[in-house]
Amino acid sequence: MDFTSDYAHRRMVKFLTIILIGFMTVFGLLANRYRAGRRERFRFSKANLAFASLWAIAFSLVYGRQIYKEYQEGQINLKDATTLYSYMNITVAVINYVSQMIISDHVAKVLSKVPFFDTLKEFRLDSRSLYISIVLALVKTVAFPLTIEVAFILQQRRQHPEMSLIWTLYRLFPLIISNFLNNCYFGAMVVVKEILYALNRRLEAQLQEVNLLQRKDQLKLYTKYYRMQRFCALADELDQLAYRYRLIYVHSGKYLTPMSLSMILSLICHLLGITVGFYSLYYAIADTLIMGKPYDGLGSLINLVFLSISLAEITLLTHLCNHLLVATRRSAVILQEMNLQHADSRYRQAVHGFTLLVTVTKYQIKPLGLYELDMRLISNVFSAVASFLLILVQADLSQRFKMQ
């Protein structure tokens, strides 16, 4: 990879970051002001906080009034996946507004101290991996909302054909707000993953050179002074990599912790959506096979869309967290594969220090200090959801057969 493409990658990441900060400010989710060239780039702003407060109050009043009106008219049906999904996203959006205003000062300090672009300059990002990550992020932030908008349009054409399509955008907006911080969390982890991949490539290059220098033919070819000089240079580079790894671990933890509440709420929403989605599909089939009612194909299709989105959201997040953990374990494996038999003492010290750092921290994703988010945890959660679904289905079938 040449320096031109590496510079283009950094510019791309910087451009996407600026767009993200701009959208967060416009929608009232960032009550801080950005000032380029200052030591504290992000500073708490009372004007931005007032703007965010107006957003929060207006959003709560508009959508709270809608829920209250539907409750009075008896239109709330929590067995419907789309209705439950909408209510949950409205709730999460309000919580996001309030939580972001409470921690706005903390967020400003964290963002100001993160050496984000300095760290990017240290590493060359792989083109293929970066583009795949950006595509996945765009699928999550753009393709999923568009798919849900299509489902809303189909549902409105079926239930309220006289209403304007603007109403579907009104229903989609809470979903965008509720997922905004979650998408920021996802994007931050994508960047961390790419930096860890780049760091591992640097370690692999060192592994090849260190092991090559200690082969028998190479020991005879180079003088002891040359090897000592080369090992000292490699040790300096390894210390720099360890320093960058520590920065990644410390600052990403400080950034992800205040954002993790939104992620946990989003996971809860998706798990409830999966439960109701599967139950709605079963309910439609049971009505047809047992009660003899006509099968609601369009309603099942709409429920299937929301069910698929929830499954895809959890799958993407789980795989990303798993890739982060695998990348961290890969760093430890590379360090352990280094042959230190004829290495300089300075280099041995650098390797042992870096190994200790990696094995102790392990870069575990622990939202709010809770369980480590990985494939095992998600599989256990899915097992619990499946068990709960079986209980619901069994109870419904028992009631249906009693009525006959």
UniProtKB/Swiss-Prot annotation:
Entry's Gene Ontology cellular component terms: axon; dendrite; membrane; neuronal cell body; plasma membrane
One GO biological process term: signal transduction
Superkingdom of the source species: Eukaryota
Membrane topology per record: Multi-pass membrane protein
Stretches that traverse the bilayer: 12-32, 44-64, 134-154, 172-192, 261-281, 297-317, 377-397
Physiological role: Probable gustatory receptor which mediates acceptance or avoidance behavior, depending on its substrates.
Family membership noted in the UniProt record: Belongs to the insect chemoreceptor superfamily. Gustatory receptor (GR) family. Gr22e subfamily.
Protein name according to UniProt: Putative gustatory receptor 94a
Species of the source: Drosophila melanogaster
